[in-house]
């Protein structure tokens, strides 16, 4: 009973869900990539600033 109901609902909805999820995953992947790039760039700039002891001492 429940399985036939699931099949009736899921089969027409399945392509829609998979397409939406693909777009979500692409978005998530792009966002994480952007965040990673920003963080690595931020670390690099902090490392450059940290070379001078005055900055490293006063910035915590």
From Swiss-Prot:
<keyword id="KW-1133">Transmembrane helix</keyword>
<dbReference type="GO" id="GO:0045259">
    <property type="term" value="C:proton-transporting ATP synthase complex"/>
</dbReference>
<dbReference type="Pfam" id="PF08039">
    <property type="entry name" value="Mit_proteolip"/>
</dbReference>
<feature type="transmembrane region" description="Helical">
    <location>
        <begin position="15"/>
        <end position="36"/>
    </location>
</feature>
<comment type="similarity">
    <text>Belongs to the small mitochondrial proteolipid family.</text>
</comment>
<dbReference type="InterPro" id="IPR012574">
    <property type="entry name" value="ATP5MJ"/>
</dbReference>
<comment type="subunit">
    <text>Component of an ATP synthase complex composed of ATP5PB, ATP5MC1, ATP5F1E, ATP5PD, ATP5ME, ATP5PF, ATP5MF, MT-ATP6, MT-ATP8, ATP5F1A, ATP5F1B, ATP5F1D, ATP5F1C, ATP5PO, ATP5MG, ATP5MK and ATP5MPL.</text>
</comment>
<keyword id="KW-0496">Mitochondrion</keyword>
<keyword id="KW-0472">Membrane</keyword>
<keyword id="KW-0812">Transmembrane</keyword>
<protein>
    <recommendedName>
        <fullName>ATP synthase subunit ATP5MPL, mitochondrial</fullName>
    </recommendedName>
</protein>
<dbReference type="GO" id="GO:0031966">
    <property type="term" value="C:mitochondrial membrane"/>
</dbReference>
<comment type="function">
    <text>Mitochondrial membrane ATP synthase (F(1)F(0) ATP synthase or Complex V) produces ATP from ADP in the presence of a proton gradient across the membrane which is generated by electron transport complexes of the respiratory chain. F-type ATPases consist of two structural domains, F(1) - containing the extramembraneous catalytic core and F(0) - containing the membrane proton channel, linked together by a central stalk and a peripheral stalk. During catalysis, ATP synthesis in the catalytic domain of F(1) is coupled via a rotary mechanism of the central stalk subunits to proton translocation.</text>
</comment>
């Amino acid at each position: 009973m429940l399985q036939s109901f699931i099949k009736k609902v899921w089969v027409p909805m399945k392509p829609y869900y998979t397409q939406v999820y693909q777009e979500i995953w692409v978005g998530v992947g792009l966002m994480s990539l952007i965040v990673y790039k920003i963080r690595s760039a931020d670390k690099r700039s902090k490392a450059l600033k940290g070379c001078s002891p005055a900055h490293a001492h006063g910035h915590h």
